[in-house]
From Swiss-Prot:
PANTHER family to which the protein is assigned, alphabetical: 30S RIBOSOMAL PROTEIN S13/40S RIBOSOMAL PROTEIN S18 (PTHR10871), SMALL RIBOSOMAL SUBUNIT PROTEIN US13M (PTHR10871:SF1)
InterPro entries linked: Rbsml_uS13_C, Ribosomal_uS13, Ribosomal_uS13-like_H2TH, Ribosomal_uS13_bac-type, Ribosomal_uS13_CS
Gene that this sequence comes from: rpsM
Protein name: Small ribosomal subunit protein uS13
GO molecular-function term, one example from the UniProt record: tRNA binding
Organism of derivation: Salinispora tropica (strain ATCC BAA-916 / DSM 44818 / JCM 13857 / NBRC 105044 / CNB-440)
RNA-binding listed as a keyword: yes
Record's signal peptide: none
Length: 126
């Protein structure tokens, strides 16, 4: 199994897709990397030579922030926003959507499951 920047690439997938398993590398970056190294996007990960793996590793490590470094940077950015108390930081602290989505309905994935609030009982009919 081909291993690149700490991630096992799926052997059966085309390189264009397999590279997206690396955090911080999407389809566009994968294609840019393959074009810069001169490797065909249609090639399967199992068919990579050691030389091509080294080329890919060097290109990704020198040109992009990926995996642990990127995760740390994102976490630090969020922590900084929370500390300075800006609007986005407050939304992070409260566990609400940060980018302007509505919260009157929906937003359940960010807010968690519904917490039912006890209310007044309706009087029964006779």
């Amino acid at each position: 199994m081909a291993r690149l920047v700490g991630v096992d690439l799926p052997r059966e997938k085309r390189l264009e897709i397999a590279l997206t398993y690396i955090f911080g590398v999407g389809r566009t970056r994968a294609l840019e990397t393959l074009a810069a190294t001169g490797i065909s996007p249609d090639k399967r990960a199992r068919d990579l030579t050691d030389e091509e793996l080294v080329q890919l590793r060097d290109h990704i490590e020198t040109n992009y922030k990926v995996e642990g470094d990127l995760r740390r940077e994102v976490a630090a950015d969020i922590r900084r926003k929370v500390e300075i108390g800006c609007y986005a930081g407050i939304r992070h602290r409260r566990g609400l959507p940060v980018r302007g989505q509505r919260t009157r309905t929906n937003a359940r994935s960010r807010k968690g499951p519904k917490r039912t609030v006890a209310g007044k009982k309706k009087p029964g009919r006779k």
